[in-house]
Amino acid sequence: MTKKRTWKFWAGRTILGLLVIGGLWLTNLIWFRPFNINHFYDKVFIELAISDPELVTQLGIPVLYDIYKEDLSDASDKKGWEDFLKLKDDLAALQSYDFESQSKENKLNTKILSWYLRKQIEGEPFFYHGYPVNQMFGVQSNLPSLMESSHKLRDESDIEAYIIRLSKFGAKFDQVLEGLRIREEKGIIPPQFVIDRVISEMSGFIGKKGSNHINLEITNEDPVKSNILYTHFNSKLAQLEDLTDQEKKAYKIKVENEIRTTVFEAYGALILYFEALKSKATTEDGVWKLPDGNDFYQYQLSENTTTDYTPDKVHQIGLSEVARIKTEMWDLLTLEGYADTTKTLGEIIQKLNKEERFLYQNNDEGRKEVID
């Protein structure tokens, strides 16, 4: 064997070896237990991202963005339970790494992730305790927000993905409805004010308003062309110079048709569901009204404070803190000559806020004076 052939032989074997090692590392990272805990953290994030196309879009993750830009996240009950069971698998994998051999930073990361996973798993009895569609968030507001603020419209590929996503609104809303019906069967029903606001929000979105007979009457001449999904697309499309006017017109028609049929029909189905649900709703709005509501409240308290305080203890802390702060405020007001026992603390503060020396003009000069 000549020197040249010997070099090629060993170079080839080296490259092959590196490919095998790289393949083993990638295989372990994706399908099995990663070799070290840093790779495990990477695995958890990657798995989260690839299972949630909407999150990928919101984060604008390179490469992954283009792979998943036609998809919407799975909101089915089955997927929800799959994600929950994965939490248990992730915790078991995390616990398989030797804690004492980890760096100081990784020990902290492990403690935080372990606590989070344990706390989520503890919440299994309350898997359905929540209102997926409410006046603050839900598919009815999250999806339009995603399409308007996160879905890019840079070229024809993005445009096609936008239209495909619009065509999937119906399937997504059906998944959400599935979860809502399961909750309804379990007695987990939003209070009346939540239902009223959600119906009003969705009716406004499709340019209609609800009547006392559940029917919907049109309030805008063409609600599609005034809808954010259409107006946003139209404004972005106008900025693309690589498309002819004829091509732009064709895309606008496609978007208009998807909104008018798929999107608006999905919203209409959700509106009708909540209209029917109103007869079962009450004015009670505390979690105590839910099945095992007191236990759920305790769980939420633990999850959001990282303590084992009881609801009564937290309430007492609140009362004592309010009393302490009020006492300190009265002391300060007395010291400054503002104490007036014939008035409430709130009345004194309101009067204090109106004093000329505490007021500044709402202009550049006034703002400069505040800073100085």
Segments predicted by a language model, with ranges:
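N-terminal secretory signal peptides that target proteins for export/translocation
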Residues: 1-4
